[in-house]
Amino acid sequence: MANNKSAKKRAIQAEKRRQHNASRRSMMRTYMKKTVAAIAAGDKEAATAAFAVVTPILDRMATKGLIHKNKAARHKSRFFAAINAL
């Protein structure tokens, strides 16, 4: 446990960041699941709409450092390929 004032402050800040990141990660995963569900249902219009929503979210999370930029690119590429295959 933190023994001095600055270490206690850093622990509090780290916990705030962890909660904030967990919220953002959950939101990102929710939109990804909606896209996957639309693709699985075979509804190209809904899948395209969901993809249009999830793309900027993935880009934003990669820019903020929540996920790696290659992970965002991989998800976008796979979603795009799956939608085109419908």
Swiss-Prot record:
It comes from Vibrio cholerae serotype O1 (strain ATCC 39315 / El Tor Inaba N16961). GO terms for molecular function: small ribosomal subunit rRNA binding; structural constituent of ribosome. This is Small ribosomal subunit protein bS20. GO terms for cellular component: cytosol; small ribosomal subunit. The keyword Hydrolase does not apply. HAMAP family: Ribosomal_bS20. Belongs to the bacterial ribosomal protein bS20 family. The keyword Ribonucleoprotein applies.
